[in-house]
C-alpha cells in the first residue's frame, strides 16, 4: 500500500481547476503509486478587459474599413490578419478608431494591435486617461 505525505502544494500559475473529489491514489506494489487527476470546467472566464460597447464599435469600424462580407463574424478575438488585413489596412483601422473615439494612438501602441480586443482595450485605456 502506498502513502504520500506533504505539508503544502502550490502552483505558480494554475492552468486548470481540479476537482479534489476526483483525485485518487492507488498502487499495486510497494513503491509504485499512480495519480489520476480529472480536470473540471472553470466556473467563469474573463474574455475581454474592454467594455462590450467599445468592442462592438471596434467591430463595426473593422468591418467597414476592410469591407468584410455580410455574415462574417467579427468578435473580440478576431485577428485583423484573419480578415485579410495587411499593415496598411491596420493603419487605416487605427485612423478610423482615432477619429471615432477622439483619441491619439502612439505608433508603438498601434503596432501592438492585432485583434479587435487589443484595439478595444487600448481605446478604453486612452479614453480613461483623457478624461482623468
UniProtKB/Swiss-Prot annotation:
**Key words, A-Z:** Chloroplast, Fatty acid biosynthesis, Fatty acid metabolism, Lipid biosynthesis, Lipid metabolism, Phosphopantetheine, Phosphoprotein, Plastid, Transit peptide
- GO CC terms for this protein? chloroplast
Metabolic or biological pathway: Lipid metabolism; fatty acid biosynthesis
Q: How is it modified after translation?
A: 4'-phosphopantetheine is transferred from CoA to a specific serine of apo-ACP by acpS. This modification is essential for activity because fatty acids are bound in thioester linkage to the sulfhydryl of the prosthetic group.
Its predominant location is plastid
User: What are the GO MF terms of this UniProt record?
Assistant: acyl carrier activity
**Any Pfam family hit:** PP-binding
Chloroplast among keywords: yes
* Highest taxon of the lineage: Eukaryota
Q: Transit peptide from where to where?
A: 1-49
Q: Where is the Carrier domain?
A: 52-127
Query: Any idea which residues bear O-(pantetheine 4'-phosphoryl)serine here?
Result: 87
Extract the InterPro entries matched here.
ACP, ACP-like_sf, ACP_chloroplastic, PP-bd_ACP, Ppantetheine_attach_site
Cystine pairings recorded for this chain:
none
**Any idea what job this protein has?**
Carrier of the growing fatty acid chain in fatty acid biosynthesis.
The family note in this entry says: Belongs to the acyl carrier protein (ACP) family.
- Return the PANTHER family for the record: ACYL CARRIER PROTEIN
Q: Give the protein's recorded name.
A: Acyl carrier protein 3, chloroplastic
> What is the organism field in this record?
Hordeum vulgare (Barley)
Amino acid at each position: 500500500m502506498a502513502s504520500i505525505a506533504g505539508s503544502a502544494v502550490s502552483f505558480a500559475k494554475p492552468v486548470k481547476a481540479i476537482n479534489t473529489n476526483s483525485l485518487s491514489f492507488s498502487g499495486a506494489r510497494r513503491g509504485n503509486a499512480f495519480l489520476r487527476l480529472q480536470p473540471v470546467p472553470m466556473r467563469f472566464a474573463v474574455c475581454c478587459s474592454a467594455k462590450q460597447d467599445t468592442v462592438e464599435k471596434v467591430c463595426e469600424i473593422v468591418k467597414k474599413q476592410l469591407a468584410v462580407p455580410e455574415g462574417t463574424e467579427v468578435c473580440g478575438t478576431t485577428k485583423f490578419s484573419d480578415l485579410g488585413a495587411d499593415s496598411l489596412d491596420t493603419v487605416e483601422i487605427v485612423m478610423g478608431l482615432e477619429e471615432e473615439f477622439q483619441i491619439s494612438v502612439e505608433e508603438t501602441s498601434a503596432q501592438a494591435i492585432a485583434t479587435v480586443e487589443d484595439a478595444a482595450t487600448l481605446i478604453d485605456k486612452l479614453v480613461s486617461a483623457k478624461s482623468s
